[in-house]
Regions:
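Aromatic/hydrophobic beta-strand junction motif of beta-rich domains
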Residues: 30-37
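Bacterial N-terminal signal peptides
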Residues: 1-10
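Catalytic-site microenvironment of enzymes
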Residues: 11-28, 45, 49-51, 55, ...
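Extracellular acidic loop/turn motifs
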Residues: 39-43
Length: 386
């Protein structure tokens, strides 16, 4: 049954995103999600274009937008609604070139390494292997010193940050030859290296303590689904199923929350440390940025922030992908997440599905699928321990 325990919206027609008066970044299009009554068989029209309606009444549309105030008109038979939202103006050229990172250079010839300072606040972007963006490898404040070298025949500077190489335009940096820099490329130390790297092998599940963390909670709703349901609620429902599956497998399990409370971000990994947990698993569901089509970017993945967590994430993600064959598997990925950076406890964060997609909303609240995902997580932990 669809959405057991969660009532359908009472309104005959609703829009969950974008919200009334909401401000969007400088985009050329946005997704619109909402729901119509399942008893209304009339065509659904969004800004003049007929839009498919999922069997639950949920719908997704992509509409073009322009800078300034935009008006959204949604009609379904005799029902209609109007929504206004604001799109930001695109950035205008500044006094120096904007940061345009690249990720590789074929056979670059580097000049003599020297020190460079950042001209202003700078984000060193990391390319993600999943269809979304917004992640950063490093945040560099003004006057931050990096080791760099000019790339001959190009207008780029190769820089070394924490053992990784990147390329920046010279307008982002100021050369400072007098500042001493390391002569070798020394990676930033991994705090997790101070702890045992192997999982608890040779012990029964009853000796392994696992902390399950339902993401968000309280006033922190997380993402929204077409019916306007909150990610925090489906995270809790899925986390409870994972807790039950882990206990059935014999593990000792605690949860960071079992209600609509909000444990602070850093209190969650701290609880894992204080309670001497062996594993930390944070449960989330995804959504994409406004100008992406959720149907095109839908995927499942598991994140970790260090090598200890990555092995755990890979084992769990392999099992989750097997029970979700219709969703793109983006594998286990590394990402600097506050809840996963605890070096003392192998930690990972699940992004099970994209709830801003009508069919994914239905699947994510389905108790039977939640049970399959939960059993996959439990089996993944067992695989990791072998």
């Amino acid at each position: 049954m669809f959405a057991v325990g969660i009532p359908l919206v009472s309104a005959a027609l609703s829009v969950a995103f974008p919200g009334e008066g909401q401000s969007l970044p400088a985009v050329e299009r946005t997704y619109v999600i909402g729901a119509a009554s399942v008893s209304n068989s009339a065509p659904l029209v969004v800004n003049g274009a007929t839009t498919d309606v999922w069997r639950t009444g949920a719908f997704l549309a992509m509409v073009p937008v322009k800078p300034g105030t935009n008006t959204l008109n949604v009609m379904c038979g005799k029902e209609s609604l109007e929504r206004r939202f604001v799109v930001a103006e695109p950035p205008k050229p500044g006094s120096w070139k904007p940061f345009k990172p690249i990720t590789s250079a074929k056979d670059p010839r580097l000049g003599k390494p020297s020190a460079w300072r950042t001209r202003g606040t700078l984000f060193a972007n990391r390319v993600r292997p999943v269809p979304d963006d917004g992640d950063t490898l490093h945040y560099l404040p003004p006057q931050f010193t990096v080791r760099g070298a000019e790339v001959e025949g190009t207008d780029w500077i190769a820089v070394w940050i924490g053992g990784k190489i990147g390329f920046l335009p010279p307008a982002s940096l100021v050369k400072t030859p007098a500042v001493p820099v390391p002569s070798a490329n020394k990676p930033a130390p991994d705090p997790a290296a101070c702890f045992p790297s192997a999982p608890p092998r040779g012990v029964p599940p009853s000796a392994v303590r696992i902390l399950v963390d339902p993401g968000h909670g309280g006033s922190d709703t997380g993402a929204l689904s077409p019916h306007g349901w909150c990610e925090k609620d489906v995270n809790l429902s899925q986390a409870r199923a994972i807790r039950d599956a882990l206990r059935k497998a014999g593990f000792q399990v605690l949860m960071t929350r079992d209600d609509d409370s909000f444990p602070t971000l850093y209190s969650r990994p701290k609880l894992a440390y204080d309670e001497h947990m062996d594993v930390f698993i944070s449960v989330h569901h995804n959504a994409c940025r406004a100008d992406r089509n959720p149907r095109e970017v839908r995927h499942t993945t598991t994140y970790a922030s260090n090598e200890r967590g990555l092995a755990l994430a890979a084992a769990i993600q392999k099992r989750i992908a097997a029970v979700l064959p219709d969703i793109k598997n983006s594998g286990a990925q590394t990402k600097s997440l506050a809840v996963c950076r605890n070096p003392a406890v192998p930690s990972c964060l699940l992004e099970v599905d994209f709830i801003n997609l009508p069919e994914a909303e239905e699947a994510s609240w389905d108790p039977e699928r939640q049970k399959k995902v939960a059993e996959a997580v439990a089996q993944g932990v067992l695989d990791w321990m072998k």
